[in-house]
Amino acid sequence: MGCIEHKKTPATDDTGQDYNPYDVMEPRLPGKTPVDRRNGKHVKANDIPPEGVYLPNNNILAPHMKSPEYVQLSNAAAITLGIMGGRMYRCECTRCLNLLLTYPEGCRANCAYCGLARHREAERDYADRNFIRVDWPAVPMRDIVDIVAKDPENSPFHRMCISMITHPRSEQDTFDVLEQWTNKIDPNAIPVSILSNPTTMTRDDVQRTKDLGADIFTVALDAATPELFDRTRGKGVQSPHKWKKYWDIMLEAKDIFGPQKFGAHIIVGMGETEYEVLNLVQQLVDLGGHSHMFCFFPEDGSLMDHLPATPRDQWRRVQLARYLIV
């Protein structure tokens, strides 16, 4: 379900409201990006070859890394794999290995709450952007596969998830990354999920992910209503995503993957009412799908980094209601 940081998420905001209303949660408009910073132009022009693991560092020019040869993974996953130093606080490992596709051009969408959004190319290279409040080292995919393939039955990871981004190569590279994994690691030992990019996908793409070994297909709706989706993920922030296309692909996944093998991510506290988010949860249940809920927390560098985190009371009410629904 996700969690909140109690010290920074009071039960109510400064005005005494115990929810984030729509009129307060207005993203900033994206600014213009200098021509020489667009589409990873300077990274590709310098063409610095990568050398093994790349740890995000905004003080240097990022190497020219791209999927399917390279993927990014969270600090927690990198620590668990043993490819970077550090210890997990109050937990020895993370159980899901999330692999994020990566390119010098970065994600071409511009979602208001996301640290990977296109507008950030004005300030930092794609490989150096924070996402979900942590860094994501870039690692050769073959290295990840080789480490996990040594003993998948006893791996700390219980699942692997490929996270797509909005990029012209995203579909084919997802297939390639998935094949690299399943060629050496039995999906029965470590099942595979796809966190999809519906904007550029077709039904055939959805079918191919299943044919290659994925057993769960998820769509990151994130916003609970069409209006909120458009405001934070669509034309409101000069981004290409459309609510209808996301639903179309999710319904294709329903047909292809079957009950409880498809679903959606939902972020609570971006301006929706509690009725609206729970109505979405109910729709997913009625379809035979699942929901993954997260509470909004402002991501540094995003177009919503000035807005309040989800009040604790709102988050707990929605969590409890979802529990009763599902």
Placement of each model-derived feature along the sequence:
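Intrinsic-disorder-associated, low-complexity terminal segments enriched in Asp/Asn/His/Tyr and depleted
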Residues: H6, D14, D18-N20, D36, ...
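N-terminal intrinsically disordered, low-complexity tails
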Residues: P10-G31
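N-terminal [4Fe-4S]-dependent radical SAM core
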Residues: R28, G40-N110, G115-D135, I147
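Core AdoMet radical
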Residues: R118-D173, N188-D205, T209-W247, H290-H292
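Conserved glycine-rich "GG(E/T)P / GGGxP" loop and the immediately following alpha-helix
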Residues: H158-K184, G269-E276
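Surface-exposed amphipathic alpha-helices with a cationic face
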Residues: L178-P187, K210, M250-G258
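Short beta-strand/loop segments at the ligand-binding rim of alpha/beta enzyme cores
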Residues: D186-S196, F257-I266
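Conserved C-terminal portion of the radical SAM core fold
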Residues: I216, L221, T225, W243-L303, ...
